[in-house]
C-alpha cells in the first residue's frame, strides 16, 4: 500500500512566505551500498502566513503556522569517513547551519561520520539509525497514539511523518530544482501491516528489488529533514486548529454559612 499519493506531492510544490525569523537546516542520507547516493536536503523553517504554488497565486493560511520549506536537494560525492565529514562541515558553515540543525543517517558506516561530526562540529548534531525503534513522540498534536504505538521502527515513522507534513501543509517543496526523482520515490514507497497493530515501511533493498530502480535516497533525506524539525523545532503540528477555550460564567453560590446569625427570640 502506498504512503504518499501523487496528489500530495503535487500540492506540496510551491514557496512559503515567512513572516518572522527563519532557521536553516539540513539532513544527509549517507551512501552505504554500491548504488546509493549521498543526498543532502537543505531547507528553512519558521512562521508563515501562506504560500505560492506553481500557478503564482498566493494562498493565505487561515492562521499563521510554523512550516518547513525544502529549498533544494543535492548529491555529494562518496568519500572516506573524515573526508565526508569535512565536506558536510564545509557545507553547513557555508549555509550557516548550526550543529543542532544538522542531521545525518548514522546507519552502518554512517555512525563513524556522525561521531566525527559531533567531535569536530558540535555534539548537538543529530544522528538517526534506521534500525532504531520509533520514538515516543506524537507526529501530530491531534494523534491519540505515539509513534511507537503505530509504526514498526523509526524508518517507518520517518516516512509517515513526512506524509503527514505533506497532507496537512506543513511542508512545501521549492519548484526551483528538479523533483522528478523525489516524486517517483515518494509515490512508489510501500508499507505493510505487521503484528501488534503496527505498520512497517519496506526497506531500501526491498524497494530496489520491487521497482528495479535506484535506492530512495532523496526520499529518505527529506524524511530526515522533517524528523529533525519535529524533534527540535519546539512546535507540534496539528490536523485542525485548536478550538479556543470557552469562558463559562459561574454565578457564585451563597451558602448558609455566609449569612450572619440574627436572634429573633426577643
Task: Describe the residue ranges of each PLM region.
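RNase H-like, metal-dependent nuclease domains and their acidic two-metal-ion catalytic environment used
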Residues: 1-131, 137-140, 144-145, 152, ...
Amino acid at each position: 500500500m502506498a504512503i504518499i499519493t501523487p496528489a500530495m506531492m503535487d500540492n506540496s510544490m510551491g514557496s512559503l512566505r515567512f513572516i518572522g525569523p527563519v532557521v536553516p537546516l539540513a539532513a544527509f542520507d549517507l551512501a552505504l551500498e554500491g548504488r546509493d547516493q549521498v543526498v543532502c536536503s537543505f531547507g528553512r523553517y519558521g512562521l508563515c502566513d501562506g504560500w505560492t504554488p506553481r500557478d503564482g497565486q498566493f494562498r493565505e493560511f487561515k492562521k499563521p503556522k510554523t512550516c518547513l520549506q525544502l529549498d533544494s536537494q543535492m548529491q555529494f560525492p562518496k568519500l572516506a569517513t573524515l573526508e565526508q565529514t569535512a565536506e558536510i562541515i564545509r557545507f553547513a558553515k557555508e549555509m550557516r547551519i548550526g550543529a543542532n540543525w544538522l542531521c545525518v543517517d548514522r546507519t552502518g558506516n554512517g555512525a563513524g561520520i556522525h561521531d566525527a561530526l559531533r567531535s569536530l562540529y558540535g555534539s548537538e548534531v543529530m544522528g538517526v539509525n534506521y534500525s532504531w525503534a520509533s520514538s515516543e513522540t506524537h507526529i501530530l498534536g491531534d494523534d491519540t497514539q505515539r509513534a511507537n504505538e503505530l509504526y514498526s521502527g523509526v524508518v517507518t515513522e520517518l516516512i509517515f511523518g513526512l506524509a503527514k507534513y505533506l497532507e496537512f501543509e506543513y511542508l512545501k517543496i521549492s519548484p526551483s530544482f528538479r523533483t522528478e526523482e523525489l516524486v517517483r520515490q515518494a509515490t512508489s514507497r510501500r508499507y505493510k501491516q505487521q503484528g501488534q497493530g503496527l505498520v512497517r515501511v519496506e526497506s531500501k533493498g526491498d524497494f530496489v528489488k520491487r521497482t528495479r530502480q535506484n535506492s530512495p535516497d532523496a526520499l529518505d533525506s527529506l524524511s530526515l529533514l522533517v524528523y529533525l524539525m519535529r524533534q527540535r523545532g519546539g512546535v507540534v503540528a496539528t490536523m485542525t486548529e485548536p478550538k479556543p477555550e470557552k469562558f463559562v460564567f459561574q454565578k457564585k453560590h451563597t451558602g448558609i454559612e455566609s449569612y450572619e446569625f440574627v436572634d429573633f427570640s426577643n
